[in-house]
A protein has these predicted regions:
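Active-site core of glycosidic bond-cleaving carbohydrate-active enzymes
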Residues: 1-7, 15, 26-64, 68, ...
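A motif-centric feature for acidic-aromatic and gly/ser/thr-rich catalytic loops and repeats
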Residues: 22
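Acidic/histidine-rich catalytic neighborhood
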Residues: 76-136
Length: 188
């Protein structure tokens, strides 16, 4: 999947994109590109989500050989986000863009839309990915990764914080948008 994700990173995000990306769907042919509908296909944190499972396996087993084998996947996914995230213009947060909160939509100026900057799901997945990658390098004693890990730790501090909406729930987007379907089965 990683070689396919490296190609997708370059093809869809340009030559500055490093590492690899996995959007929210894949198949046995290592499909990593965006899906055909923006309400779910624009979400580019599938690789971060998969890496969370790699980390959880290590956290459960403590298998250092396994961690050394999967570290390149963690690092590559982190490199992708470090090289492609942008500054949200209103508050200066480091965000994924374009993206979406999968399959959910909100109203903006009376129109149902799905594309946004920095949905909460992405922010949490990237936060965990950066923290887990830095912890993996430290656990493995990879002192040559110190500068890279410092950049991950710095980036974590620039991600948007979780915010509570006017109605008392975790906001799904950076803005407290009105959801088109308040009973939607997916939440951030």
């Amino acid at each position: 999947m990683i070689p396919s994700g490296q190609k997708t990173a370059k093809d869809f995000y340009g030559n500055q994109a490093r590492g690899w990306v996995q959007h929210m769907m894949t198949n046995v042919w290592n499909y990593t590109a965006p899906g055909e509908h923006p309400s779910w296909g624009a979400t580019n944190t599938g690789g971060a989500w998969l890496c969370d499972h790699l980390w959880e396996h290590f956290a459960y087993t403590g298998d250092m050989e396994y961690l050394a084998r999967v570290y390149p996947a963690l690092k590559g996914a982190s490199q992708f986000f470090l090289s492609t995230m942008i500054r949200e213009p209103k508050r200066g947060y480091l965000v994924t863009a374009p993206s979406s909160s999968p399959e959910n939509t909100f109203y903006e100026n009376g129109v149902a839309v799905s594309i946004c900057m920095g949905p909460t799901m992405d922010t949490q997945l990237v936060r965990e990915l950066f923290q887990q990658t830095a912890e993996a390098a430290a656990t493995l004693g990879y002192s040559d990764q110190e500068a890279f890990c410092d950049s991950l730790k710095s980036a974590v501090k620039e991600l948007a914080p979780h915010k509570i909406s006017e109605e008392g729930y975790l906001m799904e987007w950076l803005e407290d948008y009105e959801e088109t379907d308040i009973h939607h089965r997916h939440i951030s």
